Amino acid sequence: ISLFLVESEFEGFSKGKNLEKLGMKAQDTSELFFQDVRVPKENLLGEEGRGFIYLMQDLPQERLSIAVGAIANAQALLESTIDYTKERKAFGVSVASFQNTQFKLAELSAEISSAEVFLDRCTELLLNDELDTVTASKLKLVATDLQCKVADECLQLHGGWGYMLSLIHISEP
């Protein structure tokens, strides 16, 4: 596999419309069409046959950035749920005062803290050019699974309101 730079004015190249995504909105995603495109030799990026290696070199940093977002989202979900449980009353007291709520929030907080330690270690490895794909993949797995767990547990702590969009504050670009 080799990498080539295909310029937008090359005959046979066309770009479809931008597709709407749920996340990562800062980068465009669209269909690209290559109909008998001819690319000159000077548009080869790097060495011939090393394209896959070049792509794999960036995977650890890409996986690290996904983990950063997942951990930040988990923390934001936890913080908003803590605020909600303090305000929400049931049986005349705040939901935050219930023992089960305290256990759940403490458990989630501890798991987020653990993921942050792993993230800090991986960031240190990246800065020293020592972060490998396997370790970065483990971090991504841990962080994204944790984000899902935190979202599910926090949804439960919101009760029926956890299923209502009116409670969520979504900012559109």
Descriptions of predicted regions:
Residues E31-F33, V37, G49-R50, Q57-S171:
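Alpha-helical interface subdomain recognition
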Residues N43-E48:
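Cytochrome P450 core scaffold surrounding the K-helix E-X-X-R motif
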Residues I1, D28-T29:
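Short coil/turn connectors at secondary-structure junctions
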Residues K21-D28:
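Short Gly/Pro-enriched turn/cap motifs at secondary-structure boundaries
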Residues I1-K17:
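A short core secondary-structure module
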Residues E7-E11, K41-E42, Q75:
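Basic, amphipathic alpha-helical recognition segments used for DNA target recognition
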Residues F4, Y54-L55:
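Hydrophobic side chains in well-ordered alpha-helices of soluble proteins
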Residues K17-L19, R38:
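Short, well-ordered turn and helix-capping elements at secondary-structure junctions
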